[in-house]
């Protein structure tokens, strides 16, 4: 997904949304593996109903894994996919439904990003093969053409082209058939699957996998008999699954993913037997297995743990953060969540480049939230409604961002320069420490001679070999536990130190070159396509313009390794020997990348449009044209997330985004989309694959990609420009490929279609979802009686949700299926046998279509879990919300302070002006006395009175009495209760209110007091007067903020602070 590092940012800001998955693993008894019994209760303490697999997140890491050798062939790949999928199912244990969704043909808006990724992936695969060939020649030269056969085979082996994981290729056809076989096999052989319904949506069904899943969830919500308390789990590595989970408005929703930040050094240790890999409660008392002759080896764990991301807890956090005190319209959490999702689109998505002034690592989302909160009173309503954006209100948010853009760019540059200076300093200090350690080692050596010449260039006294070169890596064991690799190497060096020395001197050159090339490959983003489309291990997915992904080598990913160590390794060119070719030195790490636009200097907008778009910098109308296209894109993306694809043919026609200041009069735009039809699979292949991946495309189209006479040869450049766009590495830059002209492409392909074989025509067709159930499922007899009895029923059979256990939709007979026929297998040699009697049932499944708009609201009958956040969590979130978004690159604060409020409505009237007391004087920021200046005429309450210790005092008499004396948030009969749709399925009488007694005020969460005033928990003592009548309580500390919120819009200056 296009918000890079979103997962890391969310987990840092909202820590309680993450929890580890408790997983039971199979174990061995007397050499026999005992499988996990998933019919037992879920060890995570909560049963799950539906599991959805975004299958590309499984296919990519299984076909080209990181950290271990890839499967030898496609059969082994299928087995790895089965194992991984089985593990996910075992840990989730869905009780009702499993949906497997593979990416089909994507909307045109996504194809531009796919095209850039696949061109980059093919280029990197080609470079990897060239490096392997170069290394093979070097080994042959250094060893006199005597190279180990196994090593020779590994070097010569071509890099597997991950571009075949695209709809329409033979590989995807094999994947679809293999998945259907494996599901049927599980239904026949695994009792835990007997009551499970499985839906497979393979690559022949148009749409991205995660969006096909969302379409299914929306269709089930529209069914009258849908259970509103269905518990959903979706697996995938894309960060947008989090926002899609929010967009469903299903309160019981989790995202499952690998813990990509897991550190192997923190393996679990059992305190009973002392072995790693399990905890005490999982101990089976087995003897420790000896690894190595002296038990010097450590048995590493090959399985990464999984984690939950609880969307329900994220909803709680956002409920506190997005609530604006005294907003002039009812607070509606579901609408506010939609606005939050919409604002995330500005920071990055798969369809639009992010705005230049917004970066998630600079807390760009916080900046937008702060602007949104400030403008809520002015907008008079929310930004979005059921997937439709109000562009007039969006204009206000962009105007607010535009006022901060100059300061954001300047502060970004200052931060980059500080970071560079710190890196230089750390490197210099590390170098000085290393030199000092080297001097100490030389002094302690019996061969030490205090001479000016370097020790390494002299032979020691008494003859013998020369001292080893300084570049030779030495092992310095720490006091703590040595890593497995270090123990193995230490043991080897002790036993075979003589051989190690001779081998080291002979092979140092080859090792240095190999290491250098591998590190260069890592820098350049090897397997960039895989990481972005499923095999991501330590980062969230890159956006369309390939944003900075520094997390790829961050210390938290690499364990205890320091950032400067990583950089030193990345630039280490080794120590070439006599026969080694010179290794080019990497670009200097102590210099900022060249940036000719210079966003931090005056005139950056002119330079930006002149260099990036190639237009006259004075052409203001072009800037507005780009901004209008971007606004259209925002509307498209929002509809795509909340209602489904609004247009298969629309796309953003530029490589770069406009500035926030360029969005002028977008509120007057009328946006409509032509639905269109999706591409056929071969058309997408021709649109996204480079010519070097033509092996995945039918031969009849090859000449269109390679012949100089081809009418579309310009679509397939062998070399293409990469704009670093201020980044350090090429893989972070913007790939400048020509956009595909749909009409030209389809016209050229139309001439070749008659030459396709029957199998190729079948791969190019549009498929359907299939539903599989076992013979033991109650629905089995119902469907067999309709489709396979002597008196057959209707052709399209509408499912009875009581019999189907909550599944809505229609099914049709699958002509390729015959009841109780054999189930052939092409994987028998891998332990997947054929079955003589297939006792499962396969039918075509049709997702029900609804004529109604999917409403952004909770369904009637929802029952919430107990709140996960306590009052302290809520107050902390609210405090941050009121003081965030300024110190991360926005306009400077008055007096250099952090936080505070900013009014972006300098040219708009104060919406509260008619209600303010003319005699009121707002508090002065930074009051010397430490406490606020109280309103004139205000008198402290008498101890023991009704208003005593009840939060902040009331405003002056006659001032905002209407708003202050309303029942506080979470208190009072019916204030935030609503009817939740009584009398109608969608609860349209809800009016944006929430029953606090059932959710947000459970367990006295808000202490029965006004949540916008903070309650007793927010005042650090609950009122100072209760402590002897002095002013020590926390109430006055927050009163200043309360007054700021009440009167923040009085300031007429756009950068005023209160």
Curated annotation (Swiss-Prot):
Subcellular location per the Swiss-Prot or TrEMBL entry: Nucleus
Bias-annotated ranges (Polar residues): 534-556
Keywords linked to the UniProt accession: Coiled coil, Exonuclease, Hydrolase, Metal-binding, mRNA processing, Nuclease, Nucleus, rRNA processing, Transcription, Transcription regulation, Transcription termination, Zinc, Zinc-finger
UniProt GO BP: DNA-templated transcription termination; mRNA processing; nuclear-transcribed mRNA catabolic process; positive regulation of chromosome segregation; rapid tRNA decay; rRNA processing
Zinc finger boundaries on the chain: CCHC-type: 268-285
Region annotation Disordered: where it falls in the sequence: 418-490, 520-588, 881-908, 935-1058
Residue ranges of coiled coil: 407-443
Function: Possesses 5'->3' exoribonuclease activity. Required for the processing of nuclear mRNA and rRNA precursors. May promote the termination of transcription by RNA polymerase II. Essential for vegetative cell growth and chromosome segregation.
Protein name: 5'-3' exoribonuclease 2
Species of provenance: Aspergillus fumigatus (strain ATCC MYA-4609 / CBS 101355 / FGSC A1100 / Af293)
